[in-house]
Curated annotation (Swiss-Prot):
This is Probable glycine dehydrogenase (decarboxylating) subunit 2. It is an enzyme of class 1 (oxidoreductase). Its cofactor is pyridoxal 5'-phosphate. GO terms for biological process: glycine decarboxylation via glycine cleavage system. It holds the Pfam family Aminotran_5. The glycine cleavage system catalyzes the degradation of glycine. The P protein binds the alpha-amino group of glycine through its pyridoxal phosphate cofactor; CO(2) is released and the remaining methylamine moiety is then transferred to the lipoamide cofactor of the H protein. Its EC number is 1.4.4.2. Transmembrane segments: none annotated. Disulfide bonds: none annotated. The lineage of its organism: Archaea, Methanobacteriati, Thermoplasmatota, Thermoplasmata, Thermoplasmatales. It catalyses: N(6)-[(R)-lipoyl]-L-lysyl-[glycine-cleavage complex H protein] + glycine + H(+) = N(6)-[(R)-S(8)-aminomethyldihydrolipoyl]-L-lysyl-[glycine-cleavage complex H protein] + CO2. One of its GO terms (molecular function) is glycine dehydrogenase (decarboxylating) activity. The modification N6-(pyridoxal phosphate)lysine is found at residue 268. The glycine cleavage system is composed of four proteins: P, T, L and H. In this organism, the P 'protein' is a heterodimer of two subunits.
Amino acid sequence: MEFRQAYYDEPLIKDIKSDTSFKLSEDVDENLLPQDMRRTDLKLPQVSEVDVVRHYTRLSQMNYTVDVGIYPLGSCTMKYNPKYADRIASFAEFRNIHPFQPESTVQGTLQIMYELQEFLKKISDMDAVTLQPMAGADGEFTGILIIKKYFEDLHEDRTEIIVPDSAHGTNPASATMGGFDVVEIPSNSEGMVDLNALKAAISKKTAALMITNPNTLGIFEQNITEIAKILHDAGALLYYDGANLNAIFGITSPGLMGFDIVHFNLHKSFATPHGGGGPGAGPVAVKSFLSDFLPVPVVGYDGKRYFLDYGKKKSIGRVSSFYGSFSILLRAWSYVIRNGDDGLKNATIRAVLNSNYLKKKVEGYYEVPYYPLKKHEFVLSTEKTGRRALDIGKYLLDFGIHSPTVYFPLIVKEAMMIEPTETVSKDDLDRYADVLISALKVPEDDLKSRPRNTAVSRIDEVKAARDLKVRW
């Protein structure tokens, strides 16, 4: 399939002038008003509907989305976003409600939020949920604040959070923002948590371990129940980063593994749109002994009506305005309703199958480090090929294929992190493998000249970072 991305020298919408626009006649002749009482024209775009449509259509043609093709950005779960969820979220009954309305007038909305809380409790095998956090990192920070408040309530001075060297970068960042010191521990030769290193790192100052399972190498932490016991025996907590939840739906759960706190990325695992800075939603679930520390309000139900419950005396308080990113919560609710238990489990099975199928297709050409069996994603290394992961990622773009995540996790040199998700076909995977393999066969100068078929070719990324010019 040939690919050439559209390119337009498109101005900002405020700079578009349209001769098809017109002004309504004035009710009062302007000449009758004193000069000092006349308003100057507002600097609003004077564009017609067709000009607006064409402007944003052209911009979309210079972009790449999951609606265009495969988007295997590792650890991001860029699955297709079903349009039925968008339609439900666009209903006027939802768009026109206001957070200040009396509870009696929004019972249906509160019911949906309550049901989503119950769905997330069941999926994670946890006991209580807040829907307030507006993103995954926001959910992490909420979890960190709960951990902090919990130990303050126990009058225990625990100041350290442990993270593996394969952790998401947001884990140490969230812990630091919460006032904790970060202790990093190495992975073992199979890419999993080194238990001896964990035991050596734990002390009376340890508050929690933050971990993703499967981890960022796509490997399931086989010793997770032992890890949980080590933490709990030391009086510490176990935190589940839900970035890779798509790999375990219906198979296992954080609660069964021994986790105390979980954050969800609804904008990933639950197929809601994300990217470009938003939108997102990062609900947090906890075991019962931590439920009093959740942000308020949560949605309650007394058997007759739904209500906003502010009755948690040990709450960390609000973590967002009002009640969360409702349009994303609504999409996630509809996704769970539509799929049910069997559908969610099937999504996981297909995601893991697609990942391992693609890995098998390319592992004779690229090194796949660490333990061989992967889950929903895997990491390649281009180091032994003599070619840079960055160059191969750019090469892929010329075939209408999005690059995987490169140079992460940091413990793999020249890393390419690939997560196909369950919503791609075998044909997509075969073509992706063919292009990955062909990237090793083209001349080096050809590889470094890519991409050539995209709207924008290579940019000077160092200069862009150092000489930042923000426009809006």
